[in-house]
Protein backbone atom coordinates (compact mmCIF):
# COMPACT_ATOMS: atom_id res chain seq x y z
CA UNK A 1 0.00 0.00 0.00
CA UNK A 2 2.80 2.39 0.90
CA UNK A 3 4.62 1.61 -2.36
CA UNK A 4 1.46 2.32 -4.35
CA UNK A 5 1.06 5.64 -2.57
CA UNK A 6 4.50 6.73 -3.69
CA UNK A 7 2.95 6.99 -7.13
CA UNK A 8 -0.63 7.86 -6.13
CA UNK A 9 0.09 10.80 -3.80
CA UNK A 10 -1.09 9.10 -0.60
CA UNK A 11 -4.65 8.51 -1.85
CA UNK A 12 -4.66 4.73 -1.29
CA UNK A 13 -3.84 4.91 2.42
CA UNK A 14 -5.93 8.05 2.66
CA UNK A 15 -9.01 6.18 1.43
CA UNK A 16 -8.37 3.38 3.91
CA UNK A 17 -7.97 5.80 6.83
CA UNK A 18 -11.15 7.64 5.80
CA UNK A 19 -13.03 4.32 5.79
CA UNK A 20 -11.76 3.51 9.30
CA UNK A 21 -12.71 6.96 10.57
CA UNK A 22 -16.26 6.58 9.20
CA UNK A 23 -16.52 3.16 10.84
CA UNK A 24 -15.24 4.15 14.30
CA UNK A 25 -16.45 7.77 14.35
CA UNK A 26 -13.74 9.01 16.79
CA UNK A 27 -13.87 12.42 18.41
CA UNK A 28 -10.15 12.92 17.90
CA UNK A 29 -7.60 11.50 15.48
CA UNK A 30 -4.02 11.78 16.73
CA UNK A 31 -1.29 11.18 14.17
CA UNK A 32 2.23 10.42 15.34
CA UNK A 33 4.65 11.37 12.56
CA UNK A 34 4.17 13.82 9.73
CA UNK A 35 5.01 11.73 6.70
CA UNK A 36 3.71 8.16 6.75
CA UNK A 37 0.82 8.99 9.07
CA UNK A 38 0.31 12.67 8.36
CA UNK A 39 0.30 12.87 4.59
CA UNK A 40 -2.16 9.98 4.27
CA UNK A 41 -4.43 11.38 6.98
CA UNK A 42 -4.56 14.69 5.13
CA UNK A 43 -5.95 12.81 2.13
CA UNK A 44 -8.43 11.03 4.39
CA UNK A 45 -9.77 14.32 5.70
CA UNK A 46 -10.22 15.52 2.13
CA UNK A 47 -12.44 12.48 1.52
CA UNK A 48 -14.56 12.98 4.63
CA UNK A 49 -17.57 15.04 3.59
CA UNK A 50 -19.47 15.12 6.88
CA UNK A 51 -18.29 16.49 10.21
CA UNK A 52 -14.67 15.54 10.71
CA UNK A 53 -13.03 14.52 13.99
CA UNK A 54 -10.59 16.89 15.60
CA UNK A 55 -7.02 16.33 14.48
CA UNK A 56 -3.81 16.37 16.54
CA UNK A 57 -0.52 16.35 14.66
CA UNK A 58 2.62 15.28 16.54
CA UNK A 59 6.02 15.80 14.97
CA UNK A 60 8.52 12.97 15.41
CA UNK A 61 12.24 13.52 15.65
CA UNK A 62 13.55 16.04 13.16
CA UNK A 63 10.84 15.60 10.53
CA UNK A 64 9.64 19.17 10.34
CA UNK A 65 13.17 20.58 10.50
CA UNK A 66 14.60 18.33 7.82
CA UNK A 67 11.73 17.94 5.38
CA UNK A 68 10.54 21.55 5.46
CA UNK A 69 13.76 22.37 3.61
CA UNK A 70 12.31 20.74 0.49
CA UNK A 71 9.50 22.66 -1.30
CA UNK A 72 7.30 19.62 -2.05
CA UNK A 73 7.48 18.36 1.51
CA UNK A 74 7.01 21.84 2.96
CA UNK A 75 3.80 22.22 0.92
CA UNK A 76 2.51 18.89 2.26
CA UNK A 77 3.42 19.82 5.83
CA UNK A 78 1.60 23.14 5.44
CA UNK A 79 -1.50 21.42 4.06
CA UNK A 80 -1.48 19.06 7.02
CA UNK A 81 -0.99 21.78 9.63
CA UNK A 82 -3.72 23.87 7.97
CA UNK A 83 -6.33 21.25 8.91
CA UNK A 84 -4.88 20.44 12.35
CA UNK A 85 -6.67 21.44 15.55
CA UNK A 86 -3.61 20.79 17.71
CA UNK A 87 0.13 20.46 17.17
CA UNK A 88 2.76 19.00 19.49
CA UNK A 89 6.48 18.34 19.30
CA UNK A 90 9.52 17.49 21.41
CA UNK A 91 11.38 20.74 20.83
CA UNK A 92 10.67 24.45 21.14
CA UNK A 93 12.58 24.72 17.87
CA UNK A 94 9.86 22.71 16.12
CA UNK A 95 6.98 24.79 17.48
CA UNK A 96 8.69 27.92 16.19
CA UNK A 97 9.20 26.40 12.76
CA UNK A 98 5.62 25.08 12.56
CA UNK A 99 4.30 28.57 13.36
CA UNK A 100 6.21 29.93 10.35
CA UNK A 101 4.62 27.32 8.09
CA UNK A 102 1.01 27.49 9.28
CA UNK A 103 -1.21 28.86 12.04
CA UNK A 104 -4.71 28.38 13.35
CA UNK A 105 -4.06 25.23 15.34
CA UNK A 106 -3.67 25.04 19.11
CA UNK A 107 -0.07 24.63 20.23
CA UNK A 108 -0.25 21.78 22.74
CA UNK A 109 2.30 21.44 25.57
CA UNK A 110 5.79 20.31 24.62
CA UNK A 111 6.34 16.64 25.39
CA UNK A 112 8.97 14.01 24.50
CA UNK A 113 7.30 11.44 22.27
CA UNK A 114 9.03 8.42 23.85
CA UNK A 115 6.85 8.55 26.97
CA UNK A 116 9.50 9.17 29.60
CA UNK A 117 11.80 7.13 31.78
CA UNK A 118 12.57 7.07 35.48
CA UNK A 119 16.06 8.24 36.39
CA UNK A 120 18.66 5.73 37.58
CA UNK A 121 18.48 5.37 41.36
CA UNK A 122 20.73 2.36 41.96
CA UNK A 123 24.25 2.48 43.40
CA UNK A 124 26.87 3.86 41.05
CA UNK A 125 29.04 1.15 39.55
CA UNK A 126 32.13 1.30 37.37
CA UNK A 127 31.64 3.50 34.33
CA UNK A 128 34.32 2.31 31.92
CA UNK A 129 32.62 2.63 28.54
CA UNK A 130 32.28 5.29 25.87
CA UNK A 131 29.07 4.43 24.06
CA UNK A 132 28.28 5.63 20.54
CA UNK A 133 24.93 5.30 18.80
CA UNK A 134 25.70 3.19 15.74
CA UNK A 135 23.57 4.65 12.96
CA UNK A 136 25.27 5.33 9.64
CA UNK A 137 22.87 6.68 7.03
CA UNK A 138 21.78 9.98 5.55
CA UNK A 139 21.43 11.50 9.02
CA UNK A 140 23.37 9.33 11.46
CA UNK A 141 27.17 9.53 11.24
CA UNK A 142 28.49 6.97 13.70
CA UNK A 143 31.60 6.12 11.68
CA UNK A 144 32.94 9.67 11.96
CA UNK A 145 32.32 9.61 15.72
CA UNK A 146 34.06 6.24 16.03
CA UNK A 147 37.10 7.43 14.08
CA UNK A 148 37.30 10.58 16.20
CA UNK A 149 37.09 8.80 19.55
CA UNK A 150 39.36 5.89 18.59
CA UNK A 151 41.88 8.43 17.28
CA UNK A 152 42.63 9.36 20.90
CA UNK A 153 44.48 6.05 21.15
CA UNK A 154 46.31 5.46 24.42
CA UNK A 155 44.77 8.57 25.98
CA UNK A 156 41.56 6.55 26.36
CA UNK A 157 43.31 4.42 28.97
CA UNK A 158 41.14 1.47 29.98
CA UNK A 159 37.93 2.84 28.51
CA UNK A 160 36.10 0.54 26.12
CA UNK A 161 34.43 1.89 22.98
CA UNK A 162 30.97 0.40 22.46
CA UNK A 163 28.67 0.96 19.51
CA UNK A 164 25.06 -0.22 19.66
CA UNK A 165 22.20 -0.39 17.16
CA UNK A 166 24.79 -0.68 14.39
CA UNK A 167 23.95 -1.20 10.76
CA UNK A 168 26.25 -3.02 8.33
CA UNK A 169 28.55 -0.09 7.38
CA UNK A 170 29.30 0.59 11.05
CA UNK A 171 29.97 -3.08 11.81
CA UNK A 172 32.45 -3.23 8.91
CA UNK A 173 34.16 0.03 9.86
CA UNK A 174 34.53 -1.01 13.51
CA UNK A 175 35.99 -4.39 12.54
CA UNK A 176 38.51 -2.81 10.17
CA UNK A 177 39.48 -0.14 12.69
CA UNK A 178 39.93 -2.68 15.47
CA UNK A 179 42.11 -4.83 13.21
CA UNK A 180 44.30 -1.93 12.09
CA UNK A 181 44.75 -0.34 15.54
CA UNK A 182 44.51 -3.30 17.90
CA UNK A 183 41.88 -1.45 19.94
CA UNK A 184 39.00 -3.35 21.48
CA UNK A 185 35.78 -2.05 19.94
CA UNK A 186 32.56 -3.77 20.93
CA UNK A 187 29.62 -3.63 18.54
CA UNK A 188 25.97 -4.66 18.75
CA UNK A 189 23.97 -4.79 15.56
CA UNK A 190 20.58 -3.14 15.39
CA UNK A 191 18.03 -5.13 17.39
CA UNK A 192 20.64 -7.21 19.23
CA UNK A 193 19.98 -5.48 22.56
CA UNK A 194 16.63 -5.13 24.27
CA UNK A 195 15.68 -1.72 25.64
CA UNK A 196 16.59 -2.86 29.15
CA UNK A 197 19.98 -4.04 27.93
CA UNK A 198 20.63 -0.67 26.31
CA UNK A 199 19.77 1.00 29.63
CA UNK A 200 22.23 -1.32 31.37
CA UNK A 201 24.85 -0.31 28.82
CA UNK A 202 24.22 3.36 29.60
CA UNK A 203 24.54 2.63 33.34
CA UNK A 204 28.09 1.39 32.76
CA UNK A 205 28.99 4.22 30.38
CA UNK A 206 30.75 7.39 31.41
CA UNK A 207 30.05 9.04 28.05
CA UNK A 208 27.29 8.82 25.46
CA UNK A 209 28.10 10.14 21.96
CA UNK A 210 25.41 11.00 19.43
CA UNK A 211 26.55 12.28 16.03
CA UNK A 212 23.87 13.13 13.48
CA UNK A 213 23.02 15.71 10.85
CA UNK A 214 19.42 16.05 12.04
CA UNK A 215 17.47 14.90 15.09
CA UNK A 216 14.75 15.70 17.60
CA UNK A 217 15.68 15.75 21.27
CA UNK A 218 17.50 12.50 20.61
CA UNK A 219 15.66 10.02 22.80
CA UNK A 220 18.85 7.99 23.14
CA UNK A 221 20.69 10.99 24.54
CA UNK A 222 17.98 11.69 27.10
CA UNK A 223 17.80 8.03 28.12
CA UNK A 224 21.59 7.97 28.50
CA UNK A 225 21.33 11.04 30.75
CA UNK A 226 18.66 9.27 32.80
CA UNK A 227 21.09 6.40 33.33
CA UNK A 228 23.93 8.73 34.34
CA UNK A 229 26.06 8.87 31.18
CA UNK A 230 27.42 12.30 30.25
CA UNK A 231 25.98 13.38 26.86
CA UNK A 232 28.17 14.53 23.98
CA UNK A 233 25.70 15.38 21.22
CA UNK A 234 25.60 17.30 17.96
CA UNK A 235 23.80 20.66 17.88
CA UNK A 236 21.56 19.48 15.05
CA UNK A 237 19.31 17.94 17.70
CA UNK A 238 17.43 19.79 20.44
CA UNK A 239 20.20 18.96 22.87
CA UNK A 240 20.50 22.64 23.77
CA UNK A 241 17.07 22.40 25.40
CA UNK A 242 18.29 19.65 27.73
CA UNK A 243 22.04 20.14 28.15
CA UNK A 244 24.06 23.14 29.31
CA UNK A 245 27.15 23.02 27.13
CA UNK A 246 30.35 22.34 29.08
CA UNK A 247 28.40 22.19 32.34
CA UNK A 248 26.07 19.18 32.12
CA UNK A 249 27.42 17.75 28.87
CA UNK A 250 28.88 18.86 25.56
CA UNK A 251 27.25 20.05 22.35
CA UNK A 252 29.27 20.15 19.14
CA UNK A 253 28.84 20.83 15.44
CA UNK A 254 28.63 17.77 13.16
CA UNK A 255 32.03 16.65 11.87
CA UNK A 256 33.90 18.91 14.32
CA UNK A 257 36.21 16.11 15.37
CA UNK A 258 38.45 18.34 17.46
CA UNK A 259 35.49 19.44 19.57
CA UNK A 260 34.34 15.85 19.98
CA UNK A 261 37.78 14.63 21.04
CA UNK A 262 38.22 17.58 23.39
CA UNK A 263 34.89 16.82 25.08
CA UNK A 264 35.78 13.15 25.56
CA UNK A 265 39.18 14.02 27.01
CA UNK A 266 37.74 16.62 29.39
CA UNK A 267 35.38 14.00 30.77
CA UNK A 268 37.73 11.01 31.07
CA UNK A 269 40.67 13.06 32.39
CA UNK A 270 38.56 14.75 35.08
CA UNK A 271 38.73 18.34 33.84
CA UNK A 272 34.95 18.17 33.57
CA UNK A 273 32.95 17.64 36.78
CA UNK A 274 31.00 14.53 35.81
CA UNK A 275 29.50 14.02 39.26
CA UNK A 276 27.98 17.50 39.37
CA UNK A 277 26.76 17.19 35.78
CA UNK A 278 25.16 13.84 36.52
CA UNK A 279 23.28 15.27 39.51
CA UNK A 280 21.93 18.16 37.43
CA UNK A 281 20.95 15.82 34.61
CA UNK A 282 19.07 13.57 37.01
CA UNK A 283 17.11 16.61 38.19
CA UNK A 284 16.26 17.54 34.60
CA UNK A 285 15.10 14.01 33.85
CA UNK A 286 12.93 13.91 36.96
CA UNK A 287 11.37 17.24 36.04
CA UNK A 288 10.87 16.80 32.29
CA UNK A 289 11.06 13.07 31.49
CA UNK A 290 9.11 11.54 34.35
CA UNK A 291 6.57 9.11 32.80
CA UNK A 292 3.84 9.94 35.33
CA UNK A 293 4.12 13.65 34.60
CA UNK A 294 4.16 13.05 30.85
CA UNK A 295 1.03 10.88 31.08
CA UNK A 296 -0.84 13.81 32.63
CA UNK A 297 0.35 16.11 29.85
CA UNK A 298 -0.79 13.63 27.19
CA UNK A 299 -4.22 13.28 28.78
CA UNK A 300 -4.48 17.06 28.78
CA UNK A 301 -4.09 17.09 25.00
CA UNK A 302 -7.42 15.36 24.53
CA UNK A 303 -9.20 17.12 27.35
CA UNK A 304 -8.28 20.55 26.01
CA UNK A 305 -9.54 19.76 22.51
CA UNK A 306 -12.78 18.10 23.57
CA UNK A 307 -13.48 20.98 25.96
CA UNK A 308 -13.08 23.51 23.15
CA UNK A 309 -15.18 21.54 20.64
Language-model features: locations:
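Donor nucleotide-sugar binding/catalytic pocket of nucleotide-sugar-dependent glycosyltransferases
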Residues: 57, 82-121
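Short hydrophobic beta-strand element within catalytic cores of glycosyltransferases
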Residues: 230-233
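Conserved donor-binding/catalytic core segment of Leloir-type glycosyltransferases
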Residues: 88, 122-153, 162-165
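Conserved acidic donor-binding segment of nucleotide-sugar-dependent glycosyltransferases
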Residues: 245-246, 250-258, 266-272
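Short N-terminal targeting/anchoring amphipathic segment
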Residues: 17-37
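Aromatic "clamp/platform" in nucleotide-sugar-dependent glycosyltransferases that forms part
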Residues: 213
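Short alpha-helical donor nucleotide-sugar binding micro-motif in glycosyltransferases
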Residues: 200-205
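Nucleotide-activated donor-binding/catalytic signature segment of Leloir-type glycosyltransferases, i.e.
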Residues: 172-192
